Amino acid sequence: MHDAIDHRGERLAHREKKEMSQALSKAEQQRKAIAERMDKHSLLASEGRAVVDQDDLFLEPPANVREVLSDSLTVAKTPPRIEFAVIPYGFRYFPELEGDKDVGPWSSWGQACYYPAEKKFFGAVGDHGWYDPNLHVVEYDCAAASVRCLPEINTLLERKPEEFGEAKIHGYPDVYRAPYQKNDHLWFCTYWCRYPEPLEHDFASGYTGGHIMSYDLASKEFLDYGVPLVRASWPYHRVDRQRGILYGIGMFGEFLAWDINRQEIKWAGYLPPEMKWFNRCLLIDEASGLAYSNNAFGESQKIIAYDPDRNRFRELPFDMPKDRQYNCNVYMRCHTRERGADGLFWGLTTLGSLFSFDPEGEKLEVGERLWPLNDAYSVTMDRSPGGRYLYFGVASHGRGYPYGSPVLQHDLKNHTTKILAFLHPYYYEKYGYIAGGSYSFKLDEKGERLFMIWNGDFNEIEILDKERRDYDSDNSANWSVPSPHDAFGHCATFVLDIPPEERKE
């Protein structure tokens, strides 16, 4: 590990991870055999090249969705063109582990970023491991219609196999160029995969916490800025691009405000008494500099604000409304990255109700659920450049396929929700791939292309359907917690070309 970090970050030498020599576990041998049998077009060996489809079958809803279409949902008239690529990470299957270790499944948990200068989208995947884990930033090249994994993060950090590591990038990767940098950088933080936190022997192995890192988009080098808060790791992070402040939220509500330009900590630690930052939401109003989230302390239903100029927190003078259907507390969950021309952030609550937040007036309005069926949990949203449309998914935790793995568009002008495409069962029947759920929806600068990383699996649908029998989807508390029927293990990118007639502003 590196004890001394340069003021401007340490450039990490390129290192390739060594191939594993251990034999696969029996369960992994079986999983590999099923995946290779289901992979009808050898996409696992395609090295990230996309296949392209445009089919009216994208617009065919499953029976359970068809029942609610006339009342709550519509389906697009024109099928989109979709590029589909399996992400080509190494070490796809795992050996038998000894001792207190865990690994798998390969999965993607962070948001996505678009870099218009190179027409590339970025996201992340990892193997959820504790020791000798694998974590990659993912790059999708629109011109080449292909996806690749950038060098493995733990290897770049020179973590040894016997040292606890990290296998998630769980927040927003953001592009920002500091005054001392010649090029644009992609900024992010790392996150552990043992919950609620590593054990004492994990820390004793040499692990100290989550890192701040960046990727030089011109030189293609990674930089490490070290661990800003010992024994904290970062399930959520964002960058205020106007002020150069990187925000991180820890597992236990630790709050990080780190000045990229000065390489200085503004705040690192817990909030004042009876305040706890919700670690799955961070609205940054770049016009005012204020940041917002829910207060996760106790039964509080307040929203809290952080002012970086005053370095102070405060509660807003109103409560977040309870969910209308379930009469329970909810938080703001997915949301647009910035306020739009209407002055509003838009998003969905933890149970899928549409909300808008006005940072100037500090007012919140909560409306109806946009997805009328169960599993309305959504963690990703983007807004069209003209502001009329919101794009989002549902059943994000790997369980969208019972509903057709829909890609949704909400029209803020007409107050209607439209399904642009059902990814399931089309990709299962043609390619053997079950599209589970996505944590990353990102539009290009024109709002014409929608990039998504989906968690999914090359598996027999009967296996997952059997696991789903005991799942109670009527209990909303189950929507965001792991279930045996979640489709994980083989991450893929989908790039959807939205037909012009389906996105008129």
Where are these predicted regions, by residue range?
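Residue-level detector of Asp-centered blade-edge/turn motifs that repeat once per structural unit
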Residues: 114-118, 181-183, 240-243, 285-288, ...
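Short loop/turn segments that connect beta-strands within beta-propeller blades
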Residues: 141-144, 216-220, 259-263, 307-311, ...
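Surface-exposed loop and turn segments in beta-propeller and other repeat-based domains
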Residues: 82-101, 150-171, 226-231, 270-275, ...
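Short, solvent-exposed loop/turn segments at conserved positions within beta-propeller repeat blades
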Residues: 129-134, 196-209, 251, 296-300, ...
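Loop/turn-rich, solvent-exposed surfaces of beta-rich toroidal or solenoidal domains
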Residues: 373-412, 418, 422-426, 431-440
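Repeated scaffold domains used in trafficking and secretory/extracellular systems
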Residues: 107-111, 157-178, 231-239, 274-286, ...
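Beta-strand-rich domains and repeat architectures in extracellular enzymes and scaffolds
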Residues: 88-135
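Blade-level signature of beta-propeller repeat domains, shared across WD40, Kelch, NHL, RCC1
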Residues: 432-505
